[in-house]
Amino acid sequence: MRRMPSRPPSKLSLLTLPLAALAACATGQGSPAPATPSSGSFPGAGAATALPAPASGAFESLEGPLWVAAQSAVLFSDVVEKNGPAAHIYRFDPAARSYAVVPTPETSPTSTNGLAVDPQGRLIATERYNGRLVRIEPDGKLTVLASRWPAADGPALNAPNDVVVRADGNIYFTDSDWGVRTDVAHAPMAVYRVSPAGELSRVLELQKPNGIALSPDGTTLYVGSDTQAKVWRLPLDGGGAAGTPTLLIDGASVPDGFKVPDGICVDDAGNLYVTNNDDAVKAIVVFDPAGHLLGRIAIPFRPSNCTFGGADRRTMYVTTLHTVFELRVPTPGLP
């Protein structure tokens, strides 16, 4: 957020997001790697600087940052409260230092959370309060990709949270119960996959799944559970099916606090940047692909998610409750 394996996949495929789309718009097996003793700052990372506040006033609850290379801009969701003002997807232009609202096809609040782009350049979004995964077509129409499990007449999804798209079009998303509707029956919280053919399948049943990301080669899926303070990894085959999950990071073994893993982004070296959405340790915690702790990047407020952007993909954008921060990092990463 790419064709595999020549280019790494991510939440953004780095393919063109059409202007029309913007205008219309289980427990794991095995043991985690031990954390290293050092838990200080992450070498080469700059200080986090707040983006300017929008003229329209304060944001409500920011999530889902997504760098769009074709627009040289970052998108993010203002999730808002279920009964609050209308939710929006915002676009920030780093060159102009200005914001714009990305129009969506529906006038009702959608409370989008996670954002991604598929190989055709279409915007994919989770809708927390509508309980569904949607796609915004180039002509502005909205296509619902998932809303119930295991069938169209089955229980409703809970509150889809984060999403990532592989280069071959496989979509993976987390479904937690944050802000879930109480007037309908719900499926168990889980991680789901929508195949390129549009088939919905359950990847992993998991308590409070949240952040989700892919390895640079698209062969590993990472999923975090914020209430369990754990991050799992799952192997993916050539068709996109997931294998047995293994526990990669256990917050109990990470020194100096790793209690609320929220969003996940990955750099070109395969290192994981996990936002720790916790007042005690407000930071992005960095791990190598084996789960060893590399350090922390301090963020002034509790971070919710992150994305790599800029022309060299070395500018990280981090969402917090009311503010977006930017900082420079030493290694390019996946949007």
Question: Residue ranges of each PLM-predicted region?
Answer:
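Short loop/turn segments immediately following beta-strands, especially the blade-tip
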Residues: 234-241, 328-335
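Short loop/turn segments immediately following the C-termini of beta-strands
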Residues: 79-80, 128, 176-178, 226, ...
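A short helix->beta-strand "capping" segment at the edge of beta-propeller domains
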Residues: 37-59, 245-248
